């Protein structure tokens, strides 16, 4: 039972590292970060909301240390996509944003565990992922 708790904490830490790496990657590629971890009630969360030129981008970050469970982008299933779309609509309405094009992206973060450390090996951006 303790190993499961540790495993959850490890996954949470890896997720946080992956999201921080994704934010840095987007900034380096001229994205303006508008918000991270946007939540509305119990509907879920959008990892990153950013702006690139005349687009507002709703970004889902998926991190993996191996491909044993498939490519990170494959974890963004139809249910997750619908949830992100719903939250995006709420964000746009709440912030009265109607002059930007909307795009849904996925950032894949590939990591490697080295002892107690987690190292980011590669980051890829999939524009218009869904």
Curated annotation (Swiss-Prot):
InterPro entries: Restrct_endonuc-II-like, tRNA_endonuc-like_dom_sf, UPF0102_YraN-like. One of its GO terms (molecular function) is nucleic acid binding. Gene3D superfamilies: 3.40.1350.10. It comes from the Bacteria. It holds the Pfam family UPF0102. NCBIfam families: PRK12497.1-3, PRK12497.3-3, YraN family protein. Belongs to the UPF0102 family. This is UPF0102 protein Cthe_0758.
């Amino acid at each position: 039972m303790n190993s499961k708790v540790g495993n959850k904490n490890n996954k949470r830490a890896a997720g946080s590292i992956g999201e921080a790496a994704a934010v840095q990657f987007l900034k380096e590629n001229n994205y303006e970060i508008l918000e991270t971890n946007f939540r509305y009630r119990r509907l879920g969360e959008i990892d990153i909301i950013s702006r690139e030129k005349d687009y507002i981008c709703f970004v889902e970050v998926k991190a993996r240390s191996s491909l044993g469970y498939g490519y990170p982008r494959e974890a963004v299933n139809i249910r997750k996509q619908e949830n992100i779309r719903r939250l995006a609509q709420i964000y746009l309405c709440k912030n009265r944003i109607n002059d930007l094009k909307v795009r849904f992206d996925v950032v894949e973060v590939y990591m490697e565990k080295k002892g107690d450390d987690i190292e980011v090996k590669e980051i890829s951006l999939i524009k218009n992922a869904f």
